[in-house]
Amino acid sequence: MFDHDVEYLITALSSETRIQYDQRLLDEIAANVVYYVPRVKSPDTLYRLVGALFRSQFIVQLPPLRLLHIVKDVFLWKLEVSEPTLPISKFYLVWNAVFESHRATWNLSQLMVLDGVLVTYPSFKQLNNAYFIDESSNKTALYYRNWKLQLFSPIWAQLWNTAIVRANLSIQHCLLIALALLFNQSNRSALLHGVDVSWNLVTEKLLDLLEEYVHGIVQPMEIFSTDSVLSTNLNHLASCLTSSITRSNEATLVNSVRKLERICRYLSDTVASLKEQQLDFKFQNVFILIILALKELSAMNMTILPNHKDTFYSMICLSLFHVHVLTQKIGTVGFPSYDYVYDNLVTYFIVMDDLSKITTVLELMKRNNTKQDPNKLVFYINFLNKITNYYGCRIRLPFITEFIEPLLHFDVFFSGKTGNTLDIEIKESIHTLTITVLSIDSSYSSQVAQWQVSRILVYLKMSMDQFIAGKLSANQILLIFGHLSTQLPSLHNYNKHLLRDSLHETYIRIVNVKNPEKKNVLIECLIVQIAFINNPHHLIGWLNICLQLINTHNKKLLQQLWEMVSSLESSLAIDWWYTTVLSSQSSKL
């Protein structure tokens, strides 16, 4: 019965009579191919069956990506189920004979048959390593290599270069997916070696394919459609795209970052309209692909012409800006490619050493829904902080007024409210930025110094109030005072009473706070500031006040007070310590 069914299938596939292939007939023949081909016992019969399949109208009538999966299923069944029929080596020998005997020009369907075989190589390798299913001493593995390099690559290039492909988007997509499915990180160079095609065009079309996929990412996907196949193979698309990028010219690279920025912008808008539970692995995989593509583009920066570099890096920056919503949700821990792209980006803007060009990028981000999108806001603030921190003394008041000052009035920062995790991150990021800008060397700009004077005491008071209200931690308030206390003396020329006022505001809060632990932390903030008093009379006065505030049993605070006093290199302060503190301690023994 089995042999009769196989012969019937061979006859059906070999028929030159025009058959009306409806969906039912296609499904029936497909099921028979998957069932019978792996089970045939005779090499001669298998040769006739595979040959009939390879030259049949049936494979032409099938959607190419479905055909690929049918052939893939045939080989996976043969490899995984290990039917007690033909040995693996003879099974592959027959397929090789069919491929080599075909002298006519290959069509798209025949290439998809070959691709369906080739995509099973990882499974073959894994199973053979584990169970030694191939007794041919590596000959079967060699078939895979030869089929890929000697058949698939040149035939794929030949089809890609034909006029019909350039005019048919559907065929383009099938060929691109067929190519991408064979890519992984280890075989990138070998697969493309000697392939005579325009890699500029391939890169362009791969990005078009990605863009189309992203536009339909939330829509239901029809089985064996382009989007459906891509959804489970974006890692292969990433390897293919990054390989193609390395073979593309400068104009294509610049156009590629423009396309990626557009894709990222659309992705950001899509994610913003979805609920948390709708963000499945498809979004994570797209995010990873985009970052890998940006990494490859960043690595090609030396090929970008000087007059295009600003645009090139601006597009990379905006791409990261748009997808920061996914960065927040997915995270970048264990993903060094993201750090590479971001660090490379920041390094460019630093090495460029031209703040006016950076303001263009900042303006684009600022106008791009930053206030309404907290994820974009986080990226914007952190990037702004990096730039401000580096350019430091070259920052001028218009820059502060335009980009930094508005952030200091955000409710999440000014009120210190603790909402969701994102609110907390925004608040902490603005605090970091505020410390950075208030720490700029004021000697380079009197306008910046005057702005710092107008802001620093307000900020310190606000920070202490937020700490007392439980909206800032002890470590955070100590960090703030540790950084900004050093700035108070340099602003003395613009406000002679700034340090005095800061000490007074700190003292008032120490006296009024009821929580003893918070009181001790604020005393630490006071100690930090006392170190910068220049007037000897005022110094001793504040040392006495500080000592009165400290509980005599609090060894930690006394130790910190001593460390501060000893660091002053002031004989007056040292004398005060020995005559006031130590004598007081001795009298209580």
Curated annotation (Swiss-Prot):
One of its GO terms (molecular function) is protein-macromolecule adaptor activity. Transmembrane segments: none annotated. One of its GO terms (biological process) is protein import into peroxisome matrix. Keywords: Peroxisome, Peroxisome biogenesis. The keyword GTP-binding does not apply. It is found in: Peroxisome matrix. Its main location: other. A motif (Microbody targeting signal) lies at residues 587-589. GO terms for cellular component: peroxisomal importomer complex; peroxisomal matrix. Required for peroxisome assembly. Present with 538 molecules/cell in log phase SD medium. This is Peroxisomal biogenesis factor 8. The gene is PEX8.
